[in-house]
Amino acid sequence: MSTNEEFAGKVALVTGSSSGIGEETARRLSALGATVVVNSAQSVEAGEAVAAALPGTAVYIRADISNQDEAHGLIDATVERFGQLDFLINNAGWTTEVPHDQLDDLTDEIFRKTFDVNVFGTWWLTKRAIPHLRKSDDPNIVNITSIAGVRPVGSSMAYSMTKAALNQMTLLLAKSYGPIRVNAVAPGLVATPWTKDWDALH
């Protein structure tokens, strides 16, 4: 394993990392020498398999970040296990495909669930993590947002709105919480198990 001095000895929590972007992020961080916490709300076996396959030190911790207690518990468990937190990668998200011109299909239940995971979950994790990140000599928060947060695209209006909220959250945190580095990555549509059936969006 070829490590990188910047990541050696660091602890990274990657939410929603049992597949897709989160999994690849966890793999890359581990390959660079970071200790990685893999997380998912479901797909427990997949998450455990990802952690087991990583080249460096890694564990899997199940938590549903749309539940405040579980989100807080995920941060607490990470710090209790490894004594520190240096990188928080807020990747976990949820959506379902609802065409933008079919508002009647965008139910309050869908709207709330999308915000609970994508916005509230990210907020709860970040707020809980900041006191620990302040103790790090290289603290980082990376929010995985989406091109849907800045353009009229995306799987649903609710999803796009949550990603716009995360973009603004990123700017405000970056301005207010230095020297913690806070950045957002806003990819377009990525081929993952989650999007494989979204023919209309491809």
Regions found by a protein language model. Give the residues of each.
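Residue(s) in the substrate-gating loop at a strand-loop-helix junction
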Residues: 146
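Active-site helix of classical SDR
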Residues: 126, 162
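Substrate-binding pocket helix/loop in short-chain dehydrogenase/reductase
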Residues: 99-103, 107-112
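Conserved glycine-rich cofactor-binding loop
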Residues: 11, 18-19
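Alpha-helical segment proximal to the catalytic Tyr-Lys
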Residues: 131, 174-178
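Conserved glycine-rich Rossmann-like NAD(P)H-binding loop of the short-chain dehydrogenase/reductase
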Residues: 32-49
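A glycine/serine/threonine-rich, flexible loop-to-helix segment
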Residues: 155-158, 188-202
